[in-house]
């Protein structure tokens, strides 16, 4: 009789240990997934691609340039994100078409996250008519659906009329 009681107690203990372990495992999984979500900037993702579709206007609201092109950003959640982009520009009548390449983005400081948008301040290289402009101050605002890239107008002769170039995330 003592043998049967020991076996029954051991069996109950095993069930208790298994149930307790399962509960600990589930709680630990929830804690880990919650902390991972906050680290990766609100689930923005580490790589994004998209297209530009921006209309530049003058101070009166008249369309001066139509901007289009492709962009790609990787390493978003790292200390050295990479931006590659081509911005094609043309007058509203289709004339004066040209393009700019953007690369060599270097992050300055830490990203700032507001309202599920990550803001990255840094510098990049942008090709212009007279050659590449290096260390061009660049601000990127990236969300799940949209990207805005702003270049300091001083070094590029106000080429983008002091406006961000906007696009969408594919």
What are these regions (language model features)?
Residues 37-82, 161-170:
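N-terminal segment immediately downstream of the Sec signal-peptide cleavage site
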Residues 64-129:
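Predominantly extracellular/secreted and cell-surface proteins with exposed
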Residues 45, 50, 85, 120-122, ...:
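Generic recognition of long tandem-repeat/solenoid scaffolds
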Residues 144-170:
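C-terminal partner/receptor-binding element of secreted or periplasmic proteins
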Residues 1-38:
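Secretory targeting signatures
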Residues 121-128, 133-154:
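Extracytosolic low-complexity repeat regions of secreted or lipid-anchored proteins
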Residues 53-58, 88-92, 152-154:
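Short, flexible beta-strand-to-coil junctions
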Residues 43-46, 77-79, 114-116, 132, ...:
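Solvent-exposed loop and beta-edge segments used for protein-protein assembly and interaction
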